[in-house]
Amino acid sequence: VDLVFTANYVSMEMLEEKVKALDDDYRIFYRRITEDLIADPAQSVDAVMERHIRNELGAVPEEKLCAAMSGMIWIDLFVRSYFREKVVQTLADAGIIVRVFGADWEKIHCKKPQNVRTSGGKVNSAACVQAMRDARIALNVMPWFKDGAHDRVFTAMLQGTAALTDDSRYLREECRDGENICFYSLRALEQLPDQVVSLLEDPVRMAELAERGYRMAEKRHRWKNRAGLLMQALRDIDK
């Protein structure tokens, strides 16, 4: 298997219907936020939400700001689904087979749907890990926080698979592009198919990248590493 993506799909048509069902003022307000995030995907969802809320309501207290933001969590789903769709469409329409493991991918619209090979529905975490292990490249699309990572990235590395993902500040700090990870840009998705082909056509380079990714993740990004950090944080609180 050349390339896998382990994630569910939420159709943009369904999300658009939810937006259309809103009152006019809310629909316009939420549309501005999603358009802002799509226009500049490097922004974090919380920062953009806060900016738009304060522009609309002025100097609101922190409690009201938090309450307003908690009711807008679906915006992350909207933007994430938009880019998941765009990424898979871009690859499939360029002739690259994408094996997707998750719900509802049969609903995606693209010019070459035969290149989107589905698992037939939801799969459990063990099946996702096995899919990564069986693949040469594991694709990721980050959630809309911009100073963290998704476990898909490190799970792929720990299976000895090359990780291909959009970036974040944290991932840039932890990883080296082209050495132990491969970054693509949501602002330049037209370059993504060439990145995939370049990796697949150079199996030695890809294997070396995957091996370096494995060594880095095995040393720094297993769950026991996170448990150690949490235990240290708890000890610091008790001091």
Locate each region found by the language model:
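Nucleotide-sugar donor-binding catalytic core of glycosyltransferases
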Residues: 1-146, 168-170
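Catalytic binding pocket for nucleotide-activated donors in carbohydrate/polymer assembly enzymes
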Residues: 78, 103-238
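A structural signal for alpha-helix termini and helix-coil/disorder junctions
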Residues: 9-12, 93, 97, 202, ...
